[in-house]
């Protein structure tokens, strides 16, 4: 089924540029933050053991050969957008500033904000956030994610971790979503609507579990139908 990326729920998996991506979040600027479904293993943060993502070998590779391959796979105009990445260190130091990128490793803040919809993988992978900065005596250690989803830090030269590229895509991009690759798409606003309708339906009294489940199923069906109609008119 084809639909606009901006209508896809957080956690939706979809193919683009010969890769599979996970929808993390939509922003008001018409962009969607996406994360590669799988890790590219055995890639250091930086071959020279520097924890500043702006000058790292991983940034150069992701925005060089890797991005070139993605664009070639699209075979036409692409939806990858440049962004200004905040390189504030994990301890709050802002020595490393920002950098302009198209493909990047998630920051710690982006990871934490979207941890609930990021699938676990068997490999460790880098984030773009430094543990601290060179001026504070920490020029080598960068943050990374364990296979269980917890955060840790490693020396930037280590190939023990891999890369899990992220990007911003134009939210108007039409994507294909297979059955089972999208969750219900119910956010806080939709959830509030469901609760309000349930209260009205049952007069503020407690329903049985079966009644509640049946009513929620019906309302979710209505929401899906509305979303599909909206996508069809994009």
Residue locations for each model-derived region?
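Short intrinsically disordered terminal tails
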Residues: 1, 228-234
